[in-house]
Curated annotation (Swiss-Prot):
It comes from Salmonella dublin (strain CT_02021853). This is Fatty acid oxidation complex subunit alpha. The record marks 118, 140 as: Important for catalytic activity. The gene is fadJ. Catalyzes the formation of a hydroxyacyl-CoA by addition of water on enoyl-CoA. Also exhibits 3-hydroxyacyl-CoA epimerase and 3-hydroxyacyl-CoA dehydrogenase activities. Its EC number is 4.2.1.17, 5.1.2.3, 1.1.1.35.
Amino acid sequence: MTTTSAFMLNVRLDNVAVVAIDVPGEKVNTLKAEFAAQVRAILKQIRENKALQGVVFISAKADNFIAGADINMIGHCQNAQEAETLARQGQQLMAEIQALPVPVIAAIHGACLGGGLEMALACHRRICTDDVKTVLGLPEVQLGLLPGSGGTQRLPRLVGVSTALDMILTGKQLRARQALKAGLVDDVVPQTILLEAAVELAKKERLAQRTLPVRERILAGPLGRALLFRLVRKKTAQKTQGNYPATERIIDVIETGLAQGSSSGYDAEARAFGELAMTPQSQALRAVFFASTEVKKDPGSDAPPGPLNSVGILGGGLMGGGIAWVTACKGGLPVRIKDINTQGINHALKYSWDLLETKVRRRHIKANERDKQLALISGSTDYRGFSHRDLVIEAVFEDLPLKQQMVAEVEQNCAAHTIFASNTSSLPIGDIAANAARPEQVIGLHFFSPVEKMPLVEVIPHASTSAQTIATTVKLAKKQGKTPIVVSDKAGFYVNRILVPYINEAIRMLTEGERVEHIDAALVKFGFPVGPIQLLDEVGIDTGTKIIPVLEAAYGERFSAPANVVASILNDDRKGRKNGRGFYLYGEKGRKSKKQVDPAIYKLIGVQGQSRLSAQQVAERCVMLMLNEAARCFDEKVIRSARDGDIGAVFGIGFPPFLGGPFRYMDALGPGEMVATLQRLAALYGPRYAPCEQLVRMAERREHFWTNGETDQGN
């Protein structure tokens, strides 16, 4: 084999063939179409060597087995037939691996996903390391696809149909011990002995196929299967609202394989893969994947980042505690928390303890790893321990004089190079830096709640922020596991600015008599994870509406909400889930009682609560205002690109990923259609729907947000 091959064969003295996987020039192994010839050449050598006792496939990369197939291959397909052929080629290659006459072992360390797991499933046995980096899964559904190289057929036969359905329909990734319990792997070992353990397994005679648990055998039979698939179809339809065609095809293909045999199953899998690859949903989901990958590579500015060895946090509340956790436990950086009292510090420490203890209980980490991570977090009621911090994140109340005071204190007590990053959601960063001695080192870093779950952060430089400050802050966000977008220092920044008109319109429809559950259901049907009214309950009605006056002052009446309604709700001490009183009823511990609306809400705002609009009309009214505002943000350069705008909306507020983000969605609709729809709505509901100048210009010139030079392909 040549040195440029991604697959290298070495026959050991004990007659076990070790195939090392190492894609040249890449940090991560991915499967590409051109590798098929390399693998087939190796398989030919293995078949011809009659002295071989077994084969081990192992990665030569430091922390991944195979992270999946190269998604660019799908983008190169011009039609469903070409994509189907791609799947059949993958199926054939996996069949050749499975047909080898000697035991074949997959030795897995790190990510084993998508096509990587399909290759491992084609092996006769699998063994993996107990490392936290080791995860196994089939995430193709997240790209609007299904596993196309035999995964839908081999996985149910190995782990059982219910486990396989759960894994493939959700794309969930199993850690080592979970994979062992499910029967996906045969053993879990330390990384230091992975190869030798795999070699020993390869020397053994091929063992009989694993016997499935009784429950899985019943579910695979005709009666159990019929019941299971009926329930899965119902549950999946409720979850996807029909917006993700891949889920229904996954269920069909798995059922076909079980009912009609694997040959029919493989055929159905390849056909479905080809057809799904051409759907607009898959194209949009792949575009989101490529865009997020590009954003994660974007350094934020041309300047090199400054030092980033330790971080300080001001405020130990909900946001401060969450920021401390992602900084220490995700980023591995020492964190010092300052709060005005020890209760705040203890709250922040408990926040991290609770999250880490949950990981220990679920066996994701060991107790000593929990203690090691927690030791990175310390606290104080003064600035002791802050003198050497490279960056300090402020997470105190939304009060401008207080935040300006924090800037002065940090400049006085920290190093000359220390960056001050404000977690404000509404105050201009330029105002926070107005009295700063070093305004070039002041920046916004807007996290979303809950911090440990929300993937997006907005990085907000003001007019005087230096390029190095931007680069350092972006670097920190990435270390925290976040996807950062750089946005301009204008009221509401980007995410809140496009979210508020959407929520305001939902409140306005409520005052017109539309029912809460009807409004929320309409937007969930459209593709949002929760409706706007429920979202307001979740984030806190007081918190969610606090920014409305700020935006109204900056941009005018189009940001006004029915003030009397908001005031009535807040005056009735309704803050949402956090105090158990909101638009919805809450049971014990803040749990909603089957999403039941509190009927008292209608009397409170003086309406009967009788819906007149269709779900489509409700969704259109909310979404069109969001899209119009997003176009304004693009025009005003609040965001740097359509890419950042799409990622910000998908990751920040759950804009439907299958639509690709607001800018891809507007491109799909066309600027002419956007303008016509907004004009129609403006005639019905008022000037807040008037199409912005950007859309009008684009309609006249027949332009799009995503230019012809920007494609769905990765770089």
